[in-house]
Amino acid sequence: MVDRALKSADIVGRVPSILGIRPGQTDEEGWAAIDEFVADTDDGRKRRKALEDCIDENAYHFHAHGVELGHRYTSTAVVGDGTPFPAHTRDPELYYQPTTHPGAYLPHVWIERNGEQISTLDAVGHGRFTVITGIGGEAWVAAAEKIGAEVGVEIASAPIGYRLAFDDVYGDWARAREISDGGCLLVRPDRHIAWRSHGMADDPLSALREAIDAVLSRV
């Protein structure tokens, strides 16, 4: 993030010099520089090309969605699932590649709640942990309620699927979630994914309790 910010500042900082604008110039000198910039001369053409190139590079300054949303990291508050992060298929700074891999930010998908359109991001956060599951995931919901009471931490549940409390009306969540209907995502209050199970565990209570204990450093 810091490296990208410094690079962006460098790109933006080139514009005045390309235009010929420098500290201490008089108004007349500044306008003369602009006149030369638009002139039918080799220098004018060279500077206009330099500005066009600089504008193209500014996509990294104004449209770096990958930098803004694609944070991926490991920590003691993230429990890996033994798989690597998905490889980026496009420029990781410019393009956001959604994933539910532990350590990633929960992907945005439009779903419905009580007939109103909301984002998956609205279903989580709000200062609490959230368990996301799907059709057949009732055991995860029960486990979250029991563990939350045990540890004194609120763990909300957000069942997402066709005709569930959070209705996946268009099936977009099913395409984005990277787990099965009976799988589970444990989402932290900051909307980063702390842990996931690709399918229903043999003992969902123990599996979720182990994840919660690890994330909260209770082990």
Regions inferred by a protein language model and the residue ranges of each:
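Helical substrate-recognition/capping region of FAD-dependent monooxygenase/halogenase enzymes
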Residues: 1-219
